[in-house]
Amino acid sequence: MPAPETGASSREKSLEDLQVATLEKGRSTSSFGADNEKPHDHHSLSDTIMAPPDGKQKDHGKAVDLNDDSLFAHLQEHEKEVLKRQLDAPSVKVSFFTLYRYASRKDILIILVSAICAIAAGAALPLFTILFGSLASAFQGISLGTMPYHEFYHKLTKNVLYFVYLGIAEFVTVYVSTVGFIYTGEHLTQKIRENYLEAILRQNMAYFDKLGAGEVTTRITADTNLIQDAISEKVGLTLTAFATFVTAFIVAYVKYWKLALICTSTIVALVMVMGGGSRFIVKYSKKSIESYGAGGTVAEEVISSIRNATAFGTQDKLAKQYETHLAEAEKWGVKQQVILGMMIGGMFGIMFSNYGLGFWMGSRFVVGKEVNVGQVLTVLMSILIGSFSLGNVAPNGQAFTNGVAAAAKIYSTIDRRSPLDPYSDEGKVLDHFEGNIEFRNVKHIYPSRPEVTVMEDVSLSMPAGKTTALVGPSGSGKSTVVGLVERFYLPVGGQVLLDGHDIQTLNLRWLRQQISLVSQEPVLFSTTIFRNIEHGLIGTKFEHESKDKIRELVENAARMANAHDFIMALPEGYDTNVGQRGFLLSGGQKQRIAIARAIVSDPKILLLDEATSALDTKSEGVVQAALDKAAEGRTTIVIAHRLSTIKTAHNIVAMVGGKIAEQGTHDELVDRKGTYYKLVEAQRINEEKEAEALEADADMDADDFGQEGVTRIKTAVSSSNSLDAVDEKARLEMKRTGTQKSVSSAVLSKKVPEQFEKYSLWTLVKFIGAFNRPELGYMLIGLTFSFLAGGGQPTQAFLYAKAISTLSLPESMFHKLRHDANFWSLMFFVVGIAQFISLSINGTAFAICSERLIRRARSQAFRSILRQDISFFDREENSTGALTSFLSTETKNLSGVSGVTLGTIIMTSTTLGAAMIIALAIGWKLALVCISVVPILLACGFLRFYMLAQFQQRSKSAYEGSASYACEATSAIRTVASLTREQDVWGVYHDQLQKQGRKSLISVLRSSLLYASSQALVFFCVALGFWYGGTLLGHHEYSIFRFFVCFSEILFGAQSAGTVFSFAPDMGKAKNAAAQFKKLFDSKPTIDIWSDEGEKLESMEGEIEFRDVHFRYPTRPEQPVLRGLNLSVKPGQYIALVGPSGCGKSTTIALLERFYDALAGGVFVDGKDITKLNVNSYRSFLSLVSQEPTLYQGTIKENILLGVDKDDVSEETLIKVCKDANIYDFVMSLPEGFDTVVGSKGGMLSGGQKQRVAIARALLRDPKVLLLDEATSALDSESEKVVQAALDAAARGRTTIAVAHRLSTIQNADIIYVFDQGKIVESGTHHELIRNKGRYYELVNLQSLGKTH
């Protein structure tokens, strides 16, 4: 291999080149961040092993502060520039109109037509005041006898017809505007969702290192819903209210400008109250949204690793962590709602004062003979309607401010220019390339940990068509090589070259399409096996081949990866859905599909980041042969902890501390006896010793040997008999039920709860009310003041009638007119103060109730989700994305029956009730005629409420599906990026949203028809009232006062009934949300952690027995996993389970942990059936260390303490378990020690470091039974040796069951059970099994590490 260029001059030159390349404007990557792939060394920001002793440790949970120069002080200027470019994010100023930035010409046209209709609908009501004034003058004329009856009747009928025409116009305009705004609201929100997802897929990995997948889900669901709320029907309602306000004031000024001007003065006070209040509301709304986003990330982390949380019983601790974010959000939410309540109270107070002022001044103008009563009434009525309509703008103001606050977050991501953009066309595309990769003086620092250098001055040549293997301890920078070749990050110094071209100058998407990556923890997408493998063809020359050709390529790749046979054994073959993140497959099966995906496109460059670590020895041997074959003729970079897999590599590079320690072939390095030799020694299965053991055992009694064979055969026979028994049961069941279902699917189908429970409205109201039981005092205060506030309008109608009758007094009584006017004006002012106090107190009380309801509902829903057993999470509808989205969206919707909505409904109900009673008391004839229309109004409102609830039910599932899909893609962003699947992901998401949009349009058209009817009926009601009341007045049955009391009461009452219906969407959403919650809370899992049932164990010996256990996964009832398993473990024994992928080893562990219960047979511990034991008590004696370690956001200490219930663990205990897990020295080398934050999903640590933290957590429980599901598969040889020694020590005195693919780790087991197809085919010690030369012997030979000759 040529010596790498050295010397200062060449380094300066390459850094200079890099500067030029990286400073070219706007290049970008796809993101490589909070990927559930739990990157090991990738953003192994734990390569902290090399942290400078004085290096200030950063809080990795938070974003790096780019203005904090101390973080970058040790770096050169161009290095700072490279790091800052990868983290930089613009702060975006968002106004309401920027919510419309994606509107097309068609959208704008619809919005304009809808706006014109909304304005026209708003103008109708003030025009009604002109007719009102005209009729009032006629009423005065007929009362005083100055107008003949026939003239009065003609004027009355003409004006009443005008009312009818106005009603028809109102119906048409309201309908058009409602449909238009709801349609464009949904359409534009869809575009925002699509653009946001596209922007997320464009981001570089460093951006994801600080962003959780849960936050993305929250933004794409809850936050876009807030935007939709802000640009849908509420815009129409606001424009209507505003048009009413403007038109009313124009009418008032035209009729009599002096009086109008005096009344307008109070509007200034109104505007000041609204403006001041809105500023604070926006501020608090933003803070509340941020807190919920952080909570969403916690929820996503926990739900996606539910098996771990269940095994350790950490549900309560993790729920408390989630609740701290909820409490923070509640604090800001209450402040926001209190300000809103006071703002509305202030507005009503000012309005009532306005009437008092207008009436008082109007009386002076009437006495001065400047105006008549009709003009004063038109002006006052216009000002009254105008001011009230301005009041209707306020509640919608909250929706607009929330929408703008949510958009600020979303647009800042959309507007961020990623420095590594997979969509960009910039950069060269090479027509032909060989595949020579060279690292030249490369220095690398992860942007989210600027104080740690993870790679220093690495020069390495990886020739075309050759295999280069990277080995070394965890955190030595091996996976960083992969990250740099894939251009997930920008190096801060030196160059990475492909055939002599700096890869920074090449087109990013093209580059990634030439490379295939298989990582240690493979991510599959929730679709069929076929589609998963087909993803490997995206962007390649095969992408647009015929369907048959693509199927042929996929099947060939599966054969090469040794996956074809197990796929064909599945009932649906290649069309089998793998479930979320591939959970329905075993680790080895997932890995083989990931390998097939990588090789299907015949790539020039293959990156294997521990590609076979999850495979059993047999699969590994075959797959390794396939990979060796696949590697022929292409550049291959292999990272391996299992050294047997890289013996044949052309060049082996041993890395330590971010530098190259040595390189050469296997034989050369073994002869050199350096770093590599030590690693090999640690892992070698010493065959010489085996040979000796064989000789020593050769003189064993032959009978014993025979006996062993018989035992094996007996076991096989008995297990086949028991399987026949189950088959017999199944046949009987089939005869009985007449279906082709197996007995197990019959058993399993019972376990799936009822999909759609029907709950009555009363049940749901009681259910929601229970959340607010502790706030009963606040509720009563809120309700009391809602009643008082509701009495404001009927009182005002009474005062209004008094005012009109006072103004209608003849000239001879002007002295009385002035005296009465003064008194009634003062009354208006008093009612105004009462309204301010009532609404402020009512707003505050309900704010507290509403926010606490949301917090409790979220908290309890989260706890209910964590209560469910594992089969609940296996179901497709309960994916991490769907559940996270449910927590963020549906809880918000519950507030539709609390807070402001509930207060308003009670107020309007009081108004309607009081108005009817007063009207009936004063003039029953007219009151009854007016009241007859009210039920029609109510029916319209309830129908609309019903329609919206139906619409909500339909749309929810579609948006939940698309949200879940987006969450899955963003949480696996590294995989999406390496497959260049960005446009494919976006396309699928786009199609899901389009489908939903078409569905919802029909529903909107129907429900808007009913809403428009409810608005128009007000005018018909008024027309009827005026016609009948006028007739009574003409016949002198009623005085003006009696007419106006009845008329005003019912008019304002009917309007109030109309207001209730504008809350129908909120109530519809709340009803639907409540049904979802009730269903969740009612679903009692079979294995219930809340239950006190079952025997609680005081102690445990650790004797375990599986008796004839049959098992199938609930989501796969047709696929048997265990077929009559018999297995026994004595207390304190160390048992190992080995065998090929998918043979039931991990299932055995899952049954022991009671993640599931056996379908037939039983699992016994100390002779007790574990299904009869209390599940929490039982699990407290167990500890599980699984293949994919799970850490949560928080510090190393917090993660270790999750192993136990109590927090007061002594420092000595903590240090002891860390030393036992070989993690103590590493933790102490970190600047912040145990208080180091591990990042989202432990992303700041490498795979090996995460696994050792997980082992420390398991040991902290001091378990009686230790379950190791490939606990050391993520470790390099050196760590593995120490951790294995620690595990061996930890196993003493306790029962240990280990699933192992790496056989060197289980040589010393007391008994090794060899599994095949859900049964045990042989068992014995390592020596016995080697001597038997059976299945185990084959596995050992496959894994041998002898020299290559």
From Swiss-Prot:
<feature type="domain" description="ABC transmembrane type-1 1">
    <location>
        <begin position="112"/>
        <end position="402"/>
    </location>
</feature>
<keyword id="KW-0812">Transmembrane</keyword>
<dbReference type="GO" id="GO:0140359">
    <property type="term" value="F:ABC-type transporter activity"/>
</dbReference>
<feature type="glycosylation site" description="N-linked (GlcNAc...) asparagine">
    <location>
        <position position="1126"/>
    </location>
</feature>
<feature type="binding site">
    <location>
        <begin position="472"/>
        <end position="479"/>
    </location>
    <ligand>
        <name>ATP</name>
    </ligand>
</feature>
<keyword id="KW-0547">Nucleotide-binding</keyword>
<feature type="compositionally biased region" description="Basic and acidic residues">
    <location>
        <begin position="35"/>
        <end position="45"/>
    </location>
</feature>
<dbReference type="InterPro" id="IPR036640">
    <property type="entry name" value="ABC1_TM_sf"/>
</dbReference>
<feature type="transmembrane region" description="Helical">
    <location>
        <begin position="1016"/>
        <end position="1036"/>
    </location>
</feature>
<keyword id="KW-0325">Glycoprotein</keyword>
<feature type="binding site">
    <location>
        <begin position="1139"/>
        <end position="1146"/>
    </location>
    <ligand>
        <name>ATP</name>
    </ligand>
</feature>
<dbReference type="GO" id="GO:0005524">
    <property type="term" value="F:ATP binding"/>
</dbReference>
<dbReference type="GO" id="GO:0016887">
    <property type="term" value="F:ATP hydrolysis activity"/>
</dbReference>
<feature type="transmembrane region" description="Helical">
    <location>
        <begin position="234"/>
        <end position="254"/>
    </location>
</feature>
<feature type="region of interest" description="Disordered">
    <location>
        <begin position="1"/>
        <end position="62"/>
    </location>
</feature>
<dbReference type="InterPro" id="IPR003593">
    <property type="entry name" value="AAA+_ATPase"/>
</dbReference>
<feature type="domain" description="ABC transmembrane type-1 2">
    <location>
        <begin position="780"/>
        <end position="1069"/>
    </location>
</feature>
<keyword id="KW-0813">Transport</keyword>
<dbReference type="InterPro" id="IPR027417">
    <property type="entry name" value="P-loop_NTPase"/>
</dbReference>
<keyword id="KW-0677">Repeat</keyword>
<dbReference type="InterPro" id="IPR017871">
    <property type="entry name" value="ABC_transporter-like_CS"/>
</dbReference>
<dbReference type="Pfam" id="PF00005">
    <property type="entry name" value="ABC_tran"/>
</dbReference>
<dbReference type="GO" id="GO:0055085">
    <property type="term" value="P:transmembrane transport"/>
</dbReference>
<feature type="transmembrane region" description="Helical">
    <location>
        <begin position="162"/>
        <end position="182"/>
    </location>
</feature>
<dbReference type="Pfam" id="PF00664">
    <property type="entry name" value="ABC_membrane"/>
</dbReference>
<keyword id="KW-0067">ATP-binding</keyword>
<keyword id="KW-0472">Membrane</keyword>
<feature type="transmembrane region" description="Helical">
    <location>
        <begin position="257"/>
        <end position="277"/>
    </location>
</feature>
<dbReference type="GO" id="GO:0042626">
    <property type="term" value="F:ATPase-coupled transmembrane transporter activity"/>
</dbReference>
<feature type="glycosylation site" description="N-linked (GlcNAc...) asparagine">
    <location>
        <position position="893"/>
    </location>
</feature>
<dbReference type="InterPro" id="IPR039421">
    <property type="entry name" value="Type_1_exporter"/>
</dbReference>
<feature type="domain" description="ABC transporter 2">
    <location>
        <begin position="1104"/>
        <end position="1342"/>
    </location>
</feature>
<dbReference type="InterPro" id="IPR003439">
    <property type="entry name" value="ABC_transporter-like_ATP-bd"/>
</dbReference>
<feature type="transmembrane region" description="Helical">
    <location>
        <begin position="1043"/>
        <end position="1063"/>
    </location>
</feature>
<feature type="glycosylation site" description="N-linked (GlcNAc...) asparagine">
    <location>
        <position position="878"/>
    </location>
</feature>
<comment type="similarity">
    <text>Belongs to the ABC transporter superfamily. ABCB family. Multidrug resistance exporter (TC 3.A.1.201) subfamily.</text>
</comment>
<protein>
    <recommendedName>
        <fullName>ABC multidrug transporter mdr1</fullName>
    </recommendedName>
</protein>
<comment type="function">
    <text>Pleiotropic ABC efflux transporter that may be involved in A.fumigatus adaptation to azoles such as vorizonazole.</text>
</comment>
<feature type="glycosylation site" description="N-linked (GlcNAc...) asparagine">
    <location>
        <position position="308"/>
    </location>
</feature>
<keyword id="KW-1003">Cell membrane</keyword>
<feature type="transmembrane region" description="Helical">
    <location>
        <begin position="339"/>
        <end position="359"/>
    </location>
</feature>
<feature type="transmembrane region" description="Helical">
    <location>
        <begin position="828"/>
        <end position="848"/>
    </location>
</feature>
